Each structure stands twice: as C-alpha cells, then as structure tokens.
Curated annotation (Swiss-Prot):
GO biological process: phenylalanyl-tRNA aminoacylation
Organism from which the protein derives: Staphylococcus haemolyticus (strain JCSC1435)
Listed EC numbers: 6.1.1.20
NCBIfam families given in the database record: pheS
Residues at which Mg(2+) binds: E258
One Pfam family cited in the UniProt record for this chain: Phe_tRNA-synt_N
Catalytic reaction equation(s): tRNA(Phe) + L-phenylalanine + ATP = L-phenylalanyl-tRNA(Phe) + AMP + diphosphate + H(+)
Official protein name in the record: Phenylalanine--tRNA ligase alpha subunit
Keywords: Aminoacyl-tRNA synthetase, ATP-binding, Cytoplasm, Ligase, Magnesium, Metal-binding, Nucleotide-binding, Protein biosynthesis
PANTHER family registered for this protein in UniProt: PHENYLALANINE--TRNA LIGASE, MITOCHONDRIAL, PHENYLALANYL-TRNA SYNTHETASE
GO-annotated molecular function: ATP binding; catalytic activity, acting on a protein; magnesium ion binding; phenylalanine-tRNA ligase activity; transferase activity; tRNA binding
One Gene Ontology term, aspect cellular component: cytoplasm
Amino acid sequence: MTQNDSMAELKQQALVDINEAQNERELQDVKVKYLGKKGSVSGLMKNMKDLPNEEKPAYGQKVNELRQTIQKELDEKQELLKNEKLNQQLAEETIDVTLPSRQISIGSKHPLTRTVEEIEDLFLGLGYEIVDGYEVEQDYYNFEALNLPKSHPARDMQDSFYITDEILMRTHTSPVQARTMEKRNGQGPVKIICPGKVYRRDSDDATHSHQFTQIEGLVVDKNIKMSDLKGTLELVAKKLFGADREIRLRPSYFPFTEPSVEVDVSCFKCKGKGCNVCKHTGWIEILGAGMVHPNVLEMAGFDSNEYSGFAFGMGPDRIAMLKYGIEDIRYFYTNDVRFLEQFKAVEDRGEA
C-alpha cells in the first residue's frame, strides 16, 4: 500500500468516525484519535524521516492537508451537535404563560430630588421663576459681580476648585442671580430661584461635602423692604417644617447683602424646649439672607436709588437631613440602595 493510499484510507475512516459521533464527548475522542499528540495523523509525520529529502516537502504538505480536512470536519460536526443540543433543550422546555410574572421593582425619587422639587413648587406658587446656570463659572460672576473683588478678604471664606485663573467650579448659585440681573438691563422686577449643584474644597464628613445642592432666591423691584424678606422666609419655614413654626433673624455678614441675617426656625422636634436636633437651643439654622447690596445692583446695571431687593440661600441637603432625620450627608451621594429604598415607603404613604 502506497503512502497516498494509506492517507486516503485514514481520511475515509476519520470521516466515518466523525459522522458516527453522537455527542461532544465522543467527538472529542475522535479528535484525540486522529489529531492528538499520539494520533494517527501525527504518526504519519514520523514516517518522514525515512523518505528521501526531495520527497519530504510534498509528503509534509499532504499530511497537513489531511490534518486540515479532518479539523474542518470536526468543527462542522461540533457545530451541528451544539445546535442539536440547543434544539432539544428548547423542545423540552415549556413556559406556563398563565403563571404571574415577577414583580417589577419600581424606584422612587431621591430624597434630595424630592426636597428640591418641594421647594421649587413652593416658590412657583409665589410667582417665582426657576433659572438654571453654569456649574463651570467665570471668576467674575462667582465673586466680583457679587461685591467680592480679588482683594476682598471674604474670598478666604470659600476655598474653590479653580480650573484656570479665571474659571472655576461655582461655589454657590449666586452667579445665576448676577447673570440674570445683567440680562434685564436694569429693568425690574426680578423674581427668581436658582437651584443647582455647587462645589467647595471641603473635606467630606457627616455634615460637609465637596459637592452639594443649593437653592438661592432673588427679588429685585422698587420699594422692596426687609419686611418682604421676613414674610417670605416665615412662609417658607411653615411650608417646609410645619404651620406652627416660627423664625428668628440673627445679624450676620455676607459680602453681597447688607444688612445680612442668619435665619433660624423653631425646632420641630422639641417645639423649642431643647433637644439633640437643635443642640438644646430650641432653634435650628436653615439659611442665610439679606437685602441685596447696592454695589451688586449697580454692577448688574440697576439704579440702587430706584431699585432694592432681597436674596436668600438654603441647602436642600441640610433641609432633607432635618426633615427625614438623616445624620450623615454622605448617604445622599453613595447610591446605597438600602438607604434609598426607605424613601419608597415615604412616597407610598403620600408623604413625598
């Protein structure tokens, strides 16, 4: 029997064995039998040493062609077996369409989103306009347009994330107020709130975060008085914390308002008697406010002899912490589903 006859017979037998394989395990045995390290095709290569040098290239080529042919048939058979196995599984599996489906888990609003929307709805009802602004802001609008020139010592009050010498992540939403007044070309009235994220170089802990949410409000018109500000803040406190709440104003300092005040609300937990929430003072600080500084009005193009206004700023993070008894601001930003799921129950009870 010649070498060609031997290869042809080996090929024919390999094709028969491949065709008769009933599963992937049997097919693997066939592969080892012919193409394995000690397989029949590998054995043919050992015969090459007995051939004359001029016959070795042609012989080696034929052996490789045989190997490739067998490998191709193995691959096709393996694909066929996989398809047959899949079809069998599909035929055996049945789905009872009458069974109830799995309950879909429906999410709920994030507590900060809920708080921001509650505050927005309150001010929309008072005729305010909601205005958005840039989170990446110019130094001028973040500071100088708000009566904070480069030499002003109050700039040390806020460590900022600067991108360039003139561009930074805004440290408050007040730049939106400055830009809005500038666009009005000195014509009132202006009645807006500006919700959004702000950024400061604070070390994250239970009460501080490098990123947090702020809502600021601004009213500019003729004959706006401190009493208008006080009445607005009283309404906000009662809507957010309960109808029996009272507020008190404490003198403070902000470069963009004069006079400036810190606003406290009577403690909703102890009713002013003193507890751990109010640190036994009976009062809880909720926001800062004041009458718009004449310099801010003038830089925005308003005549400070004709127009006056008030501004206030609050942190929805702090308000949400107070309302829901949350002790760590970091819970808002860590995406812990166990924490967030609790507010689904609040929503279901209609307390949203």
